[in-house]
Amino acid sequence: MFALIDVNGMYASCEQAFRPDLANRAVAVLSNNDGNIVARNYLAKKAGLKMGDPYFKVRPIIERHNIAIFSSNYTLYASMSARFAAVVESLASHVEQYSIDELFVDCKGITAAMSLDAFGRQLREEVRRHTTLVCGVGIARTKTLAKLCNHAAKTWPATGGVVALDDGARLKKLMSILPVAEVWGVGHRTEKALATMGIKTVLDLARADTRLIRKTFGVVLERTVRELRGEACFSLEENPPAKQQIVVSRSFGQRVETLTDMQQAVTGFAARAAEKLRNERQYCRVISVFIRTSPYSVRDTQYANQATEKLTVATQDSRTIIQAAQAALARIWREDIAYAKAGVMLADFSGKEAQLDLFDSATPSAGSEALMAVLDGINRRGKNQLFFAGQGIDNSFAMRRQMLSPDYTTDWRSIPIATIK
């Protein structure tokens, strides 16, 4: 048996967690550069906001319903996600973090102590008590069925936020009323293709010929069909495979037109990518930089390019990665262009045990690991407490986040103050 715990409106819920005054108010969160709606709580959905709505188009709705709007605060969301995971891991032995707001749990052995429904309600209550985040819990024989149960738990209030189904008849009833688009991994194209075969509900898919499904759509959807029948094909991934690449990129708050500004942006991206690389305990040999204009601008000259530098010795040193990124940028930079986005990608990873080739002349910088450890240690106490001069200080091109909330959980200066009167 598997449980899926999914936070309701994660980003919006995180914003409400430290603002009691927003408890009964509609809340929504915007994408990068305050462009589109990417998260809403129940009241914001009820007011008519939809995922992907451009902010400038729905401002009348926002003002009419007094909806609280926030810029995306990824530092806060990541911190709250870690707290959410820690609470669940304190109650379950085998946990897989599927996304920032979703966790799978192996429920093996749980029924010896309590019912699955009681376990689901305990998970939900403990998460709410320790984080204030409200989640839905779905429990079933397979991960795919647990996803469906979770959908039911979050859709119908009468469930109390928990649906645990091990009964064939009740599962069939649920599958018969859900459209096939609700199945984990079934996208819009697959949904349309299945409809031409007369498969419109989840139950229709569960009853489909697995050989035909495999021949038409591939082995993954065939396994999904088997999962809908109660056969576990997707196991829990407690230790996800190591990343094969790291990408740090941003759309600029305003167009970048000077080499100095672009160099500062690329330095910042490279420094952040190197930090992520060290968190993964990996080393890289390949550093790529890409820059591009906006494909939607009809007035600007269109240009997009990418360059790659390959190192002789794998590294995780920010200085080396920044230097390589700047070399790559120099090869593709063009003047008199209004750039809308840039990014840095690291690839060709290896572990610390990677050795120099016999004929390698380069050697790692002395004291590199110790220096990077000091850098990361200082920055754990506050973002960019210590940064590279090449990143600049006043970045006019920085991502636009005019409604950014404080970093309540990671910055001492942002800890909420309670006043007793």
From Swiss-Prot:
<dbReference type="InterPro" id="IPR050116">
    <property type="entry name" value="DNA_polymerase-Y"/>
</dbReference>
<feature type="domain" description="UmuC">
    <location>
        <begin position="2"/>
        <end position="187"/>
    </location>
</feature>
<keyword id="KW-0227">DNA damage</keyword>
<keyword id="KW-0614">Plasmid</keyword>
<dbReference type="Pfam" id="PF13438">
    <property type="entry name" value="DUF4113"/>
</dbReference>
<dbReference type="InterPro" id="IPR017961">
    <property type="entry name" value="DNA_pol_Y-fam_little_finger"/>
</dbReference>
<dbReference type="InterPro" id="IPR043502">
    <property type="entry name" value="DNA/RNA_pol_sf"/>
</dbReference>
<dbReference type="InterPro" id="IPR025188">
    <property type="entry name" value="DUF4113"/>
</dbReference>
<comment type="function">
    <text>Involved in UV protection and mutation.</text>
</comment>
<comment type="similarity">
    <text>Belongs to the DNA polymerase type-Y family.</text>
</comment>
<dbReference type="GO" id="GO:0003684">
    <property type="term" value="F:damaged DNA binding"/>
</dbReference>
<dbReference type="GO" id="GO:0009432">
    <property type="term" value="P:SOS response"/>
</dbReference>
<dbReference type="GO" id="GO:0003887">
    <property type="term" value="F:DNA-directed DNA polymerase activity"/>
</dbReference>
<keyword id="KW-0234">DNA repair</keyword>
<dbReference type="Pfam" id="PF00817">
    <property type="entry name" value="IMS"/>
</dbReference>
<dbReference type="GO" id="GO:0005829">
    <property type="term" value="C:cytosol"/>
</dbReference>
<dbReference type="InterPro" id="IPR043128">
    <property type="entry name" value="Rev_trsase/Diguanyl_cyclase"/>
</dbReference>
<protein>
    <recommendedName>
        <fullName>Protein MucB</fullName>
    </recommendedName>
</protein>
<keyword id="KW-0742">SOS response</keyword>
<dbReference type="InterPro" id="IPR001126">
    <property type="entry name" value="UmuC"/>
</dbReference>
<dbReference type="GO" id="GO:0042276">
    <property type="term" value="P:error-prone translesion synthesis"/>
</dbReference>
<dbReference type="InterPro" id="IPR036775">
    <property type="entry name" value="DNA_pol_Y-fam_lit_finger_sf"/>
</dbReference>
<dbReference type="Pfam" id="PF11799">
    <property type="entry name" value="IMS_C"/>
</dbReference>
<keyword id="KW-0741">SOS mutagenesis</keyword>
